[in-house]
């Protein structure tokens, strides 16, 4: 195996030697033969060999000029770098490679040029329509310029073309240009100027040989036809205002500048607006005003002269030449000045009386305040205004009046149908009196009219009135009573000039036809109820008042309702009841007597001076019944042969010179429609001593018997009556009551 390896290696060495010997020694350059270099750029020339492991390189120019470059060798390659390229590099460079005894040489031609920038277009000025302009197209730092061609076009139109074929042996960078003069027109706006430069180096495709510049045309028109309009006029009054408007034609649109020409001829700038407004003008504002239209290529001006005339100031006084002032009010008189900035004021009366007011001046106004207005202020007031050397005066007449309130209607009393009444219409605190008229109307009918025409120089506030008497009727109800007062001062402005008061009439009718309705009756039994209703006619509807007449004649108020109701009446409720209908016009009354009937009670039967008298004495037997009206009193003397009714006066029976036969039982019966009650007594008549029969046994027995029987009968009647009142009777109860 090792033997085989030795054989193989030996064979490969022999083959390599044979291959190397077969490779020829060669030289190559990059670029191959010619190179076009831009002045200022960096250029590298490369020389390389094949067929030699360690060649030796050298560089030179064909005419043995300086290389003006840097050589770098590395292996089989050598590089010559020129940075930057200049005119010293425009040569034929030779690269020589030596390999042992063999030497090879190859050359590269370096040609230089300069065409670094696009052309530049320059105008001799702005393009103004109708005016010639020169266009210059420049190509800077060009080389070789004998190869240069410049074309100038406007739009698609070739204006000029130029080639620079002059002999140029000098090596330098030069700027070449082409100039054209033309007259622009408006139609050129938007077109373009094209400057195209060509460097004719046909063999080198990699070099930019055409450059161009483009410029859009902007054609201008210098300002012209400048016009000024003035409103309202070039002749003005001091304090007025003026507006001046300026216009100018041009392209681009001219800017407007306003200025004023000073006395020295210089211009004082005022505004950059088309409209110039001057307000509150003074005399110093007179002069020449200049408007200039200015754009990029020119200017155009127009002048106008303003004349400011002195304005006379005016004075106004308000509220007017005359004013009607109400006494007691506050009035302000104002004096105003127009056309004077700093006036001075003074006030006075036409007859130089005291002002009686307060003056306040501020700016162009002065006020005189009269507060409160009084008779001292009835004058003609003058306001004097001084402005500089001028003086003006204005007057105002202050006239007084007083008409502060509506009339007052007063009546002497209420309106009663058929009764006369006096109406008074009073106008308070009025002035002037001789201008006053008062009118009194009922509905649309004039009742009375009066004018106060008396001449009066006295200045005072007075109350004036109109009085009249009339008789109202029912038909007047609802009508309006109108008191109308007029102050006839036609040439004075004030409100109101007429005042009125209105009162609606309501005519009263006194109560009448007053009646009382009693239900069930005016005569009642004790314990019953009764309704008494009172009716009365009148306007307004009468108010009802019930009262009861007391024994002393006075009235006891009971009720204000139309109906008076008494429940469970008692005997004490008997009496005279009075119903009154009352309104503003009067009153009307009606009486009714109410009788409450009760069973007679509290009967008293007495003998005066005693129930036991002596023969010949006078005896009064009296029977009374307590507080029961319309009760019949019957006196009787009881006897076995029959009762004897005695003639009594008001329940009293008088026995004169009593005799023994007058002795006995006397009975009193009190009766009315409701019932009755009995009482009895025994009269004992004693004989005189000389009368033997006076104490007869029969008479004595009768006396004792009657003294027992009569009280017993009375008690029986009493308990029977009591039982009737309760609805039953019991002897047991009677006996208990007696005990």
UniProtKB/Swiss-Prot annotation:
Give the domain of life: Eukaryota
Q: Where are the membrane-spanning stretches?
A: 699-720
* Gene Ontology MF terms in the entry: cell adhesion mediator activity; cell adhesion molecule binding; integrin binding; primary methylamine oxidase activity
A Pfam entry, by short name? Ig_3
Cytoplasmic side: which ranges? Answer: 721-739
Please give the positions of the paired cysteines in each disulfide bond: 47-95, 52-99, 137-195, 246-291, 335-383, 534-579
Question: Where are the annotated glycans?
Answer: 273, 365, 417, 463, 531, 561
Q: Where is the Ig-like C2-type domain?
A: 25-105, 109-212, 223-309, 312-399, 408-506, 511-595, 600-684
PTM comment for this protein? Cleaved by the metalloproteinase ADAM17 to generate the soluble form. Sialoglycoprotein.
Region forming the signal peptide? 1-24
Report, as the record phrases it, the tissue specificity of this protein.
Expressed on inflamed vascular endothelium, as well as on macrophage-like and dendritic cell types in both normal and inflamed tissue.
Record's GO cellular component terms: alpha9-beta1 integrin-vascular cell adhesion molecule-1 complex; apical part of cell; cell surface; early endosome; endoplasmic reticulum; external side of plasma membrane; extracellular exosome; extracellular space
Which biological process annotations from GO are given for this protein? amine metabolic process; B cell differentiation; cardiac neuron differentiation; cell adhesion; cell chemotaxis; cell-cell adhesion mediated by integrin; cell-matrix adhesion; cellular response to amyloid-beta
Q: Summarize the record's induction comment.
A: By pro-inflammatory cytokines, including TNFalpha, and also by ROS, oxidized low density lipoprotein, high glucose concentration, toll-like receptor agonists, and shear stress.
In the record, the effect of residue 730 to A is given as: Loss of RAC1 activation and subsequent leukocyte transmigration
Asked whether the keyword ATP-binding is assigned, the reply is no
Tell me which parts of the chain lie in the Extracellular compartment: 25-698
Keywords, comma-separated and alphabetical: Cell adhesion, Cell membrane, Disulfide bond, Glycoprotein, Immunoglobulin domain, Membrane, Repeat, Secreted, Signal, Transmembrane, Transmembrane helix, Ubl conjugation
Tell me yes or no: is Endoplasmic reticulum among this UniProt entry's keywords.
no
Any domain commentary? Either the first or the fourth Ig-like C2-type domain is required for VLA4-dependent cell adhesion.
- What does the UniProt function comment say about this protein? Cell adhesion glycoprotein predominantly expressed on the surface of endothelial cells that plays an important role in immune surveillance and inflammation. Acts as a major regulator of leukocyte adhesion to the endothelium through interaction with different types of integrins. During inflammatory responses, binds ligands on the surface of activated endothelial cells to initiate the activation of calcium channels and the plasma membrane-associated small GTPase RAC1 leading to leukocyte transendothelial migration.
Can you name this protein? Vascular cell adhesion protein 1
Organism, by scientific name, is Homo sapiens
């Amino acid at each position: 195996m090792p033997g085989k390896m030795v054989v193989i290696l030996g064979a490969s060495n022999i083959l390599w030697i044979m291959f190397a010997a077969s490779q020829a020694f060669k030289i190559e350059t990059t670029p191959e033969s010619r190179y076009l270099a831009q002045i200022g750029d960096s250029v590298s020339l490369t020389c390389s060999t094949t067929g030699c492991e360690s060649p030796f390189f050298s560089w030179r120019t064909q005419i043995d000029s300086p290389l003006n470059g840097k050589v770098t060798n590395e292996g089989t390659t050598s590089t010559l770098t020129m940075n930057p390229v200049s005119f010293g590099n425009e040569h034929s460079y030779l690269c020589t490679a030596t390999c042992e005894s063999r030497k090879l040489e190859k050359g590269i031609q370096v040609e230089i040029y300069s065409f670094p920038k696009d052309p530049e277009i320059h105008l001799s000025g702005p393009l103004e329509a109708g005016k010639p302009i020169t266009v210059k197209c420049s190509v800077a730092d060009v080389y070789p310029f004998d190869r240069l061609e410049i074309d100038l076009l406007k739009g698609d139109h070739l204006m000029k073309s130029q080639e620079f074929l002059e002999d140029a042996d000098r090596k330098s960078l030069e700027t070449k240009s082409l100039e054209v003069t033309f007259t622009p027109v408006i139609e050129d706006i938007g077109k373009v100027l094209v400057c195209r430069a060509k460097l004719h180096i046909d063999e080198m495709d990699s070099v930019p040989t055409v450059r161009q510049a483009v410029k859009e045309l902007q054609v201008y028109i210098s300002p012209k036809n400048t016009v000024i309009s003035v409103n309202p006029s070039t002749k003005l009054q001091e304090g007025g205002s003026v507006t001046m408007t300026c216009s100018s034609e041009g392209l681009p649109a001219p800017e407007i500048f306003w200025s004023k020409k000073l006395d020295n001829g210089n211009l004082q700038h005022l505004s950059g607006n088309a409209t110039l407004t001057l307000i509150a003008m003074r005399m110093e504002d007179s002069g020449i005003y200049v408007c200039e239209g200015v754009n990029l290529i020119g200017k155009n001006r127009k002048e106008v002269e303003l004349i400011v005339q002195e304005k006379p100031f005016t004075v106004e006084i308000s509220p007017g030449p005359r004013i009607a002032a109400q006494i007691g009010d506050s009035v302000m008189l104002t004096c105003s000045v127009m056309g004077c900035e700093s006036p001075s004021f003074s006030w006075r009366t036409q007859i130089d009386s005291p002002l009686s007011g307060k003056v306040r001046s501020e700016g162009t106004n002065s006020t005189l305040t009269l507060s409160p207005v009084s008779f001292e202020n009835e004058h003609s007031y003058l306001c004097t205004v001084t402005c500089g050397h001028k003086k003006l005066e204005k007057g105002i007449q202050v006239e007084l009046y007083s008409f502060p309130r509506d009339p007052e209607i007063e009546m002497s009393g209420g309106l009663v149908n058929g009764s006369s009444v006096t109406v008074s219409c009073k106008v308070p605190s009025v002035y002037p009196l001789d201008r006053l008229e008062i009118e009194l109307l009922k509905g649309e009918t004039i009742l009375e009219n009066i004018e106060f025409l008396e001449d009066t120089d006295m200045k005072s506030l007075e109350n004036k009135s109109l009085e009249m008497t009339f008789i109202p009727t029912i038909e007047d109800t609802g009508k309006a009573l109108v008191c109308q007062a007029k102050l006839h001062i036609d040439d004075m402005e004030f409100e109101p000039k007429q005042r009125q008061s209105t009162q609606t009439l309501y005519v009263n009718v006194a109560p009448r036809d007053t009646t009382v309705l009693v239900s069930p009756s005016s005569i009642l039994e004790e314990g019953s109820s009764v309704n008494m209703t009172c009716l009365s006619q009148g306007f307004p509807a009468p108010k009802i008042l019930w009262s009861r007449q007391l024994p002393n004649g006075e009235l006891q108020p009971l009720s204000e309702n139309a109906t008076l109701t008494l429940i469970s009446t008692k005997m004490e409720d008997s009496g005279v009841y009075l119903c009154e209908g009352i309104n503003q016009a009067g009153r009307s009354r009606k009486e009714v007597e109410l009788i409450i009937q009760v069973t007679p009670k509290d009967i008293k039967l007495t003998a005066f001076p005693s129930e036991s008298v002596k023969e010949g004495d006078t005896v009064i037997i009296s029977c009374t019944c307590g507080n029961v009206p319309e009760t019949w009193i019957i006196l009787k003397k009881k006897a076995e042969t029959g009762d004897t009714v005695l003639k009594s006066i008001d329940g009293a029976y008088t026995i004169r010179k009593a005799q023994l036969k007058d002795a006995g039982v006397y009975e009193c019966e009190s009766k009315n429609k409701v019932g009755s009650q009995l009482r009895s007594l025994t009269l004992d008549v004693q004989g005189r001593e000389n009368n033997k029969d006076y104490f007869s046994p029969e008479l004595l027995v009768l006396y004792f018997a009657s003294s027992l029987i009569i009280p017993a009968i009375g008690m029986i009647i009493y308990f029977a009556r009591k039982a009737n009142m309760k609805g039953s009777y019991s002897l047991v109860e009677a006996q208990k009551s007696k005990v």
